[in-house]
Structures are given as structure tokens and as C-alpha cells.
């Protein structure tokens, strides 16, 4: 629905500049560090965007993210297979719930094990893949403060916010080696 989604782009830098103490407490969290270092090793870099989905906000279509996830299928197909295999290992996706997110508020839908499908960066726009995603995704309710981390190659997408009063807010993290 139009107007059902708001973002604060580059929220990491904006928080650091406006409230350094809060920034340090938030991002020095040992859980964030542990997840990031387990996936990427030390010296990772992070970007963040706060995403707010109001009641009535539509679901996203299933997709993959960085690095190849934002290319067209034709451009993705130009990359050799080893890039498709290695690209997801360079980034970790994360979301930190800033409110309770029952299923009706539309937390992230995930297709387990879809990250193992090597041609997925070129194929995720296909209707048969979208149908498979919708038939088999899992979705977890989150409590305020919960964090969800996953490979950018996992087919995923935000669910519909069918609630009448939950303004679903999450801090979306992209962490790179």
C-alpha cells in the first residue's frame, strides 16, 4: 500500500552523530559482534537502515540481497558461477526488532536452505521460484530486541502487516567483510 512503509537510510551514521553513547551501547552488543565475527571474521563493516511498516503494508516479493541480489537476472547471469557461490559469504544480513512482531505484523519470511541453490541470484525473479517460496517459507514472531541474522542468499521477504495497530519497526543491518 502506498505510504505504508518508511525508512531511515544510513541510520547507523545518523545515530552515531546524534547520540554517540546510545550508538555505542547499541552496536557494541556482544550478540551482534558474535554473529558478525562468526560469519565474516574480524574487521567487518556495517550499514543500517531503520524500516517501519505501517498496518496494511504489503509483503515483499521473495528475493536475495547483496552483492548480486540487486542486479537484473541478465546481469547476474554474466557473472561466473564462483562469484554466485562466493558473493553471499562476503555479507551477513541482520534485523533487530524495535517492537514486538507477531506474525500478523509481517516479520521476515525465509525459505530454509535456499541459500544452497547456486543459480538463485539469476533465478529468484522467476514465477516458479516465487510460488515455491510462498508455499514453503517459514516466519518467526520476534520480540522487541530480538535479532535475526541470515545469509543474503536465503530467499526472503517481509511479510504483510495485516494488523490494525502494529507499526512494525526493525533496524536492518548489512555487514560486510
Whereabouts are the PLM-identified features?
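Double-stranded beta-helix
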Residues: 78, 87-159
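Catalytic micro-motifs at enzyme active sites that drive phosphoryl/nucleotidyl and oxygen chemistry
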Residues: 37, 80-84
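Short Pro/Gly-enriched beta-strand edge/turn motifs at strand-loop
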Residues: 74-80
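Non-heme Fe(II)-dependent double-stranded beta-helix
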Residues: 1-74
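A structural signal for short, well-ordered beta-strand segments
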Residues: 48-50, 94-96, 171-175
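Non-heme Fe(II)/2-oxoglutarate
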Residues: 123-125, 154-155, 159-177
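Short secondary-structure boundary/capping segments
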Residues: 62-67, 110-113, 164-167
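Residues that flank catalytic or metal-binding motifs in active/ligand-binding sites
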Residues: 47-48, 90, 104-106, 167-169
